[in-house]
């Protein structure tokens, strides 16, 4: 079967890793092609990585506001690749991809990873996306939490599927101790424990709440350091908050790192303070690295983090509760390590790309009436995510 994956990539990040992970898992029986709108040339990093991994990849020449030309470009690619199914990733791919797919008679599937509402422009696009989703042939949601949001848009329930994000646990098999040394060098005085976080520095990620929580934690234990990887519009505001809180030596904004997965095994704890998520990739990555997690109970996070087993869940926006749970997790090294082990076991059982690919193949068969194989491993479905 020929599967085309359409997106609008601006860098090689979490959604792009998910796309290529699925491509690899489908490679034993299906052919995947990756397409991206150019985004001013910023799609180059993703397309280069796709080609490096052995997949055909191409940029869509035209883009908005030249909608007709962009739709014609995508339709031509679908015909040239003899596509059986189009997987659309993101609001631009959903809208333009559906129009192109209709033109050539190919089913279009939206992969709904979540809505951030990070600024006025994005909120407008996401509002259009919510209105438009009901016209897709199927909607894949990366968590049951996201599926609930999608159903509230008026999408027909029978068209909604939950297929969770997945993780390649083997990526975290070879730890490099030099990354721990690099982490320590971010701080003027090396801390005894490092609490890590990662994500775009934008309001919905809740890093201002993490700074407030860190102030409480460091007052109790000055040997704890916090480091956040990522860039974004809120960097200046966060820097001012950190300075005002007296955390200049204890809370570091480390910028974007493409090799974040090499640092993760050397966090003592990962925290996710977000106000909204689809299925947080960084939590899956932390668990794959054997690191415990303290997360807000938003989106798909409660479907991954077992409260009190592999980490802790707190209410979004509650800095005091976040600080208390971080302190509780760090209080016992033995419990901290056990939580990390429990998290790794969970992603090994529930969140593999092989299981994800089988669920997608079931969906493709439903859309095309093609035969599909069944497997004995756990399936990444709504049921498996919740237990």
Regions found by a protein language model. Give the residues of each.
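N-terminal strand-loop element at the rim of the active site
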Residues: 5-13, 17-68, 149, 153, ...
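A short helix/loop element that forms part of the nucleotide-sugar donor recognition site in Leloir-type
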Residues: 47-48, 173-189, 359
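A short, well-ordered alpha-helix in the C-terminal region of glycosyltransferases
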Residues: 321, 328, 335-350, 356-362
């Amino acid at each position: 079967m020929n599967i085309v994956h359409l997106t609008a990539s601006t860098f090689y990040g979490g959604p792009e890793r998910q796309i290529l992970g699925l491509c690899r898992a489908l490679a034993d029986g299906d052919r995947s092609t990756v397409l991206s709108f150019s985004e001013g040339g910023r799609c180059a990093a993703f397309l280069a990585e796709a080609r490096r991994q052995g997949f055909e990849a191409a940029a869509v020449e035209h883009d908005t506001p030249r909608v007709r030309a962009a739709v014609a470009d995508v339709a031509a690619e679908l015909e040239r690749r003899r596509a059986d199914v189009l997987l659309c990733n993101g609001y631009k791919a959903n809208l333009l991809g559906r129009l192109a797919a209709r033109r050539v008679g190919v089913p279009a599937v939206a992969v709904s990873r979540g809505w951030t509402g990070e600024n006025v422009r994005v909120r407008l696009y996401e509002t259009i996306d919510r209105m438009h989703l009901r016209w897709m042939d199927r909607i894949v949601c990366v968590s049951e939490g996201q599926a609930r949001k999608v159903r509230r848009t008026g999408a027909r329930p029978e068209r909604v599927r939950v297929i969770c994000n997945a993780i390649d646990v083997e990526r975290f098999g070879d730890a490099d101790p030099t990354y721990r040394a690099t982490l320590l060098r971010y701080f003027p005085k090396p801390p005894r424990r490092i609490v890590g976080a990662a994500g775009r520095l934008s309001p919905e990620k809740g890093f201002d709440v993490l700074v407030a929580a860190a102030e409480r934690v460091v007052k109790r234990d000055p040997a704890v350091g916090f480091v956040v990887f990522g860039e974004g519009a809120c960097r200046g505001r966060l820097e001012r908050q950190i300075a005002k809180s007296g955390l200049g030596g204890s809370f570091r904004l480390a910028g974007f790192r493409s090799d974040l997965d090499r640092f993760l095994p050397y966090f003592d704890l990962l925290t996710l303070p977000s106000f909204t998520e689809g299925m947080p990739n960084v939590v899956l990555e932390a668990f794959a690295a054997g690191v415990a997690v303290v997360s807000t109970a938003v989106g798909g996070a409660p479907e991954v983090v077992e409260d009190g087993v592999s980490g802790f869940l707190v209410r979004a926006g509650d800095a005091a509760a976040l600080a208390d749970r971080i302190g509780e997790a760090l209080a016992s090294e033995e419990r901290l390590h056990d939580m990390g082990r429990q998290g790794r076991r969970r992603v090994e059982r529930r969140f593999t790309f092989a299981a994800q690919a089988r669920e997608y193949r079931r969906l493709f068969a439903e859309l095309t009436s093609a035969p599909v194989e069944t497997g004995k491993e756990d399936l990444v479905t709504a049921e498996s995510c919740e237990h």
